[in-house]
């Protein structure tokens, strides 16, 4: 059974079954993966905004950089 990987964000994992001769019993079914993996993906999604993890955002806003911009 061949699987074609779709171009989706890293946290979405969908496999499209490509039918080959004589191997079409499982066609149309997506592969199951572990619950641990799902939890990890949820955490990753929560941590990563559009511009990366929240720690980076905090360092951009506050501190010495901001005072330099004001002066």
Curated annotation (Swiss-Prot):
Residues 23-71 are annotated as: Disordered. Residues 52-71 have a biased composition (Basic and acidic residues). This is Uncharacterized protein F54F2.6. It comes from Caenorhabditis elegans.
